[in-house]
Amino acid sequence: MFAEYINYHNEYTKRFGDHVIVLYQNGHFFEILASEDEGPNMEQITGLLNIVLTKRPSKNPNAIVPKMAGVQKDASKRHIDLLIENNYIVVIVEEITPSPNTTRAVTNVYSK
C-alpha cells in the first residue's frame, strides 16, 4: 500500500509541483503517508489539518514504517477545503473494487 501511495504522490508531484497531497482511501478513511525521505511533509500537513501524526506498525522488521495520518471519508470535505485554501492540489484515490482484492484509482483532483 505504501509503495502505491508513493507512486501516486510522485506522479502528481511531477505533474503539478510540490504542493500536492494525495488522500488515499483505506476503508472508511482517507490516509496520507510518507517515509523519512519520500512523500509529503507530514508535520506541516497534520499541523494544518489539526490531525494526529502516527506510524503504521509492521510485523516485518525490514519493512518501511511510514508516517501516517487520516481523516474519515465522511468528514473529508472540510479537510479538502482547508488544503485547497492553503494552495494545495488534492488528489483523491478511492477504492473502486471491494476487498479482498481492492483496486484504487484517482477519482478527483481539486485545486483553486
Regions found by a protein language model. Name each.
Residues 1-112:
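Basic, polar low-complexity surface loops/patches
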